[in-house]
Amino acid sequence: MSDSEEESQDRQLKIVVLGDGASGKTSLATCFAQETFGKRYKQTIGLDFFLRRITLPGNLNVTLQIWDIGGQTIGGKMLDKYIYGAQGVLLVYDITNYQSFENLEDWYTVVKKVSEESETRPLVALVGNKIDLEHMRTIKPEKHLRFCQENGFSSHFVSAKTGDSVFLCFQKVAAEILGIKLNKAEIEQSQRVVKADIVNYNQEPMSRTVNPPRSSMCAVQ
């Protein structure tokens, strides 16, 4: 088999992760791409990139190129350029932070603007993060689901800290983009649990990095 024939069996998808700062976007991307969870909050300045190759049913290899967009980018001139060409968009909010959910309207407005200008519509997924803090939830699941129904989003609830449904979220998004259906066994196999230490968020902005702190801990069960 030639190199070109081998490459034809691989797909690459651009997935853009949007949402307010401290909603857990970087932790989500890191948990998926590196199966780790950083113990300290590091503000993303501009954007970070993550890559992970997964295999979907039919032995289809898919490389997900994750664009983690900084929360302060919402008013910047580069945001539309970051979104351009994306096959998938994750709108991420913190289920314990009501404002992070409300602000998704602004993020989605930019996505719609870029989609209209490029005449392409990416798959958009609404992702409620930090479900390990269910007792502190401020956004009811019904409100989350209503927002999905009104805009045609796919719906996901995850915890970047425990790893709950993180891989499944990205797997489902990739499969939906490519028109592939996952069966029940594949979905159950993808629901991973990651052990992590308690996080103390540092409110001081820090320079961005794609490498997890050395003291981070993560174990996939």
Curated annotation (Swiss-Prot):
InterPro entries: P-loop_NTPase, Small_GTP-bd, Small_GTPase. Residues 219-221 form a propeptide. It is an enzyme of class 3 (hydrolase). SMART domains: RAB, RAN, RAS, RHO. Its cofactor is Mg(2+). Keywords: Acetylation, Cell membrane, Cell projection, Cytoplasm, Cytoskeleton, GTP-binding, Hydrolase, Lipoprotein, Magnesium, Membrane, Metal-binding, Methylation, Nucleotide-binding, Nucleus, Phosphoprotein, Prenylation. Isoprenylated. It is a lipid-anchor. Mg(2+) binds at T26, T44, D68. GO terms for molecular function: G protein activity; GDP binding; GTP binding. Regulated by guanine nucleotide exchange factors (GEFs) which promote the exchange of bound GDP for free GTP. Regulated by GTPase activating proteins (GAPs) which increase the GTP hydrolysis activity. Inhibited by GDP dissociation inhibitors (GDIs). One of its GO terms (cellular component) is ciliary basal body. Its main location: membrane. Its EC number is 3.6.5.2. It catalyses: GTP + H2O = GDP + phosphate + H(+). It is found in: Cell membrane; Cytoplasm, Cytoskeleton, Cilium basal body; Cytoplasm; Nucleus. Transmembrane segments: none annotated. Residues 35-49 are annotated as: Switch I. The modification N-acetylserine is found at S2. Belongs to the small GTPase superfamily. Rab family. Interacts (prenylated form) with PDE6D; the interaction promotes RAB28 delivery to the photoreceptor outer segments. Interacts with KCNJ13; the interaction may facilitate cone outer segments phagocytosis. Also participates in nuclear factor kappa-B p65/RELA nuclear transport in endothelial cells. Switch I, switch II and the interswitch regions are characteristic of Rab GTPases and mediate the interactions with Rab downstream effectors. The switch regions undergo conformational changes upon nucleotide binding which drive interaction with specific sets of effector proteins, with most effectors only binding to GTP-bound Rab. The small GTPases Rab are key regulators of intracellular membrane trafficking, from the formation of transport vesicles to their fusion with membranes. Rabs cycle between an inactive GDP-bound form and an active GTP-bound form that is able to recruit to membranes different sets of downstream effectors directly responsible for vesicle formation, movement, tethering and fusion. RAB28 is required for shedding and phagocytosis of cone cell outer segments (OS) discs in the retina. Also participates in nuclear factor kappa-B p65/RELA nuclear transport in endothelial cells. This is Ras-related protein Rab-28.
